[in-house]
Structures are given as structure tokens and as C-alpha cells.
Amino acid sequence: MARIVVAMSGGVDSSVAAALLKEQGHEVIGIMLRLWSEPGVIEDDGIERVVQNKCCSLEAVDDARRVARLLDIPFYLVNVEQEFKDNVVDFFYQEYVAGRTPNPCLVCNRHIRFTLLLNRALALDADYLATGHYVRVDDHPITGKRRLRRAVDREKDQSYVLHVLNQQQLAHACFPLGQYTKSEVRAMAAEWGMTVATKAESQEICFVAQNDYRGFINRYGAALAEGNSSSGPTAEAGGVITLPKPGPIYNQDGKVLGRHRGLAYYTIGQRKGLDLTSPEPLHVLKIDAQQNALVVGPALALEQASFTVGKMHYVSGEIPTEPFEAAVRVRYKAIEQPALVTPLEGKRAQVTLLHPQRAITPGQGAVFYGGDNGDEVLCGGLIE
């Protein structure tokens, strides 16, 4: 049997993952990461209140500890607030200010869960780090390399946010829930008497209070302007963090139609909040960070037949030199689309779609699937 560290969150998924491993006879250690959360904010009445978010609330910590007691496993709470802020929160803010739409889960999985926490697990002589993600991992029958595959429950599949993992990380990764459906997981939790069996799951960004990213950007930017390093971003070496600034809104012909509040408050395809008068609905077609400008136009103009991807990561570790066919997912919940992928220099790729798609958004992950059943994650990167 193996020694396995389980990343616990106080939710039903990580709780059942720990229980399954314990039932299989493994030595299980529960670790919960204390992540960064916003400090109190001053409301209109002058009273400072904590803006609630999902990062390690007292309730979540209590739930995780209660499950650990039920399973009779050690439980530790590890503070990684600064690392999370530096690697995930600052990145999230900077990307929005630069006119891109980030997915912070990609960065968190790469730098926090499967680097920082995995290293902690290995320091405890653990063989594996397990999480409650819905995804499968196995060995390729011919090459022996680790494969990342979609979960049995396609509705809950989380392979998209784990495409960033490399072979070394996958060698120590364990995903007990990959073969189960969400309803089966809840049923097991209830059978084991877990109070989290009916706990609602969050679809929100964990560190953004009330799922209001625009409000978060306002508060975070204000903290930066005031020089509050504990609640605002810290510039990394060689990097410059700026604040959202108003700028022009152009149509496709270059005519100025109005002013925007700051690039951080908009995303590709957005229609609401433009404050423009037009006989037809207008959508954000382009976010031009160099000119600090938005370009808007009709919905039909959102369609693209090709795009480029940067920071390409190949799960096998082998970088192809020839074009290859794959199914690409351009957003977390998007439907995969057939595409031709042409590798380029500098960890980039050109993607040509068989069917044009709308609102392909810079900053989002593009994840490519293939293999015998089309459920293997081949590679992924960030849309440029």
C-alpha cells in the first residue's frame, strides 16, 4: 500500500477521494492549503467588513477537519497565502489589466497544487498526491508514459484545467474520482455519514468574493494605488503592474463610438456594459492593450477559423515537428472542435478549425484531445 497525501478543501469531492483511498488500505494524510483572501473592505457606512470568498473559510476548514476525524487520518492546514497571491492572484489581475481573460485554475494547478503541495507531499515520503478532480491518469500501453484522460463523467470532467501537468507531476498524481459520476460520489459520501454529502459546489473563482471579478479588480487596483502590498499586487522582477485606464471604443472602420472604463472590465464577445447606442447589438471583437482600446462590431464578426496559441505544453514531453489533427476545447465548458494544429517555434502553435467558432478569447486555455478514443489530453496552451 502507498502513502498518499490528499489535497482537502472541505468539499464532497476531496472528502470522498480521501475515503476511497483509506478504504483501499492506503496510508492517507489530509492537507488543506490556506490560500490568499481579500482583507476587510470599508463599506459606505464606514464599517470594515470581510468580503467573503471561498478560500479556506472557517466553515470549509471545519468540514475538512471533521472528515479527517471521521476517517481517522492526520490533517494539516498549510499556509501558502503569499505563494498563492504571488503566482495566482497577481497573475489574474495583471492578465485582465492587459486585456486578456485568464483562467486562474491553470496557474494554481501548475504552481500551487502540483508544485508546492506535491513537493510537501514528497517531503513527507508520500508516493502520491491525490485530489478530488474528475479526471483519469494511466500509463500508455506502448510508450509507458503517463497519460491524462477525461473522466467517465463528461459533465464533471476537469482535464481541461490539468493539461499543464508534466510527466514528473503525473507520475505522483492520483485521481480517485475519475471513474465515478458526481451522483455516485455524493451517494458514497452519504453512505459514509459525511455531512458534506449535500454540500453545494462552487462554480466561482475561489478568491473572488461573490463571483464579482470587476469588483475584485476595483478593490485590488485601489489597494495598489494606495501602496497596500498586503492586499494589492506585488510587481515581479522585470514586470510592471498597471491600473485599468479609460480609453476609446472603435468600430471596425476605426470610428470612435465612445469610451471604456478600462480593459480589465471587458472580455471578447461581451455585449452588456458598453454604454453605446447602435441600431444593432455590438460585441467586443478585440481588446487592444497597446492602444488601450476596444474594437466592437456585430456578433457575426466574432467568428474565427484560426488562431495562435502560446506557451504550448505537451503532456508526453515530446514536441511534434509536423502538423497533427486533434479536437480543441477553447474554454472550460466549450465543446471540442476538430482542428489542425501546426507547431511553431517558441512553444507556439497555429490552430486551424474545421468549423469557425465565436469569441475565441486571448488568455483562455486551448486544450487538445486525441488518442484512440479521443479522450487523451495531448497538449495545451494559452490563446494569443
Cite the ranges covered by each PLM segment.
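ATP-dependent adenylation/nucleotidyltransferase module used to activate substrates
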Residues: 1-163, 174, 184-185, 190, ...
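AMP-forming adenylation/ATP pyrophosphatase catalytic core
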Residues: 130-137, 142-384
